[in-house]
């Protein structure tokens, strides 16, 4: 990536237009996803209305994994470059990923209660997703102590991603094997479209939050001095350490 692409003026000008496009698209996708999930998609003949939970559960499960991979990439880039934007992006990813993973577990529990007779079973897929949630929580806690510890945890935690993906193939689980693959899908198109619509909805929402976080990071340093920022955080252990502020100050002074 060209260094010029990470300059404040370039990012502020581009993210302004991107944010408007993303927000407009997200509002449209939200309305469409709700309409398709509640008004168009047919009920499963075995699950009844309970099948509508899957139109949300499946997309957020995908997002929990996608956000983790994106967070790991940002974490790795931060360790290589020490650029503050990568640190902020990884922090946003950890928060978003924890939310999506928790939402996955909760919606899965509500779906499983009438179908399996219980909110929770120690199924291989459930357990591996549960571990992913604790990896996110651990990274959130470590961020307050050491950015490096949080980064290492995120990188090591990548091993859980293929376990989540292939757990239904490696072990005998209550979850069925994947219904969507590069070879095709076993889901009827009337049910597939609402799932993909909700997935696009959550994906756009995540992109919006990443863009807004980028703008907020830049504005927070442009509108107040580095000294004031350090004093405001004095005594509060946060990943935004003195080194990060110095790095940000140097970055903002670079010629555009």
Curated annotation (Swiss-Prot):
Question: GO CC terms for this protein?
Answer: mitochondrial membrane
Membrane topology for this entry? Multi-pass membrane protein
Tell me where it mainly resides: mitochondrion
What are the entry keywords? Cytochrome c-type biogenesis, Membrane, Mitochondrion, Transmembrane, Transmembrane helix
Q: Which Pfam families does this one have? A: Cytochrom_C_asm (PF01578)
GO BP term, pick one: cytochrome complex assembly
Q: Where in the cell is it found?
A: Mitochondrion membrane
Q: Does the keyword Disulfide bond apply?
A: no
- Note the superkingdom of the native organism: Eukaryota
Recorded family membership = Belongs to the CcmC/CycZ/HelC family.
Q: What does this protein do?
A: May be involved in the export of heme to the mitochondrion for the biogenesis of c-type cytochromes.
Q: What else is known?
A: A stretch of 270 kb of the mitochondrial genome is duplicated within the centromere of chromosome 2 resulting in the duplication of the gene. The expression of the duplicated genes (At2g07681 and At2g07771) is demonstrated.
Q: What is this protein called?
A: Putative cytochrome c biosynthesis ccmC-like mitochondrial protein
Q: What is the lineage of its organism?
A: Eukaryota, Viridiplantae, Streptophyta, Embryophyta, Tracheophyta
């Amino acid at each position: 990536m060209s260094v010029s692409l990470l300059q404040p003026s370039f990012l502020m000008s581009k993210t302004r237009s991107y944010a408007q496009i993303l927000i407009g698209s997200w509002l449209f996708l939200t309305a469409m996803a709700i309409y398709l999930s509640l008004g168009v998609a047919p009920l499963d003949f075995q699950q009844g209305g309970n099948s509508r939970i899957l139109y949300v559960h499946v997309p957020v499960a995908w997002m929990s994994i996608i956000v983790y991979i994106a967070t790991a990439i940002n974490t790795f880039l931060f360790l290589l470059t020490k650029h503050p934007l990568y640190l902020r992006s990884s922090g946003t990813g950890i928060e978003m990923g924890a939310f999506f993973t928790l939402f996955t577990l909760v919606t899965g529990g509500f779906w499983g209660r009438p179908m399996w007779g219980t909110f929770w079973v120690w199924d291989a897929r459930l357990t591996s997703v549960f571990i992913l949630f604790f990896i996110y929580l651990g990274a959130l806690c470590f961020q307050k102590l050491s950015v490096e510890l949080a980064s290492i945890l995120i990188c090591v935690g990548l091993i859980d991603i293929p376990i989540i993906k292939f757990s239904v193939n490696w072990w005998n689980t209550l979850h069925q094997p994947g219904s969507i693959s590069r070879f095709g899908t076993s889901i009827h198109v009337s049910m597939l479209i609402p799932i993909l619509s909700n997935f696009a909805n959550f994906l756009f929402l995540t992109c919006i939050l990443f863009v807004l976080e980028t703008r907020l990071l830049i504005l927070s340093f442009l509108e107040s001095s580095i000294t004031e920022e350090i004093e405001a955080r004095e005594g509060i252990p946060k990943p935004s350490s003195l080194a990060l502020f110095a790095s940000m100050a140097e970055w903002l002074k670079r010629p555009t």
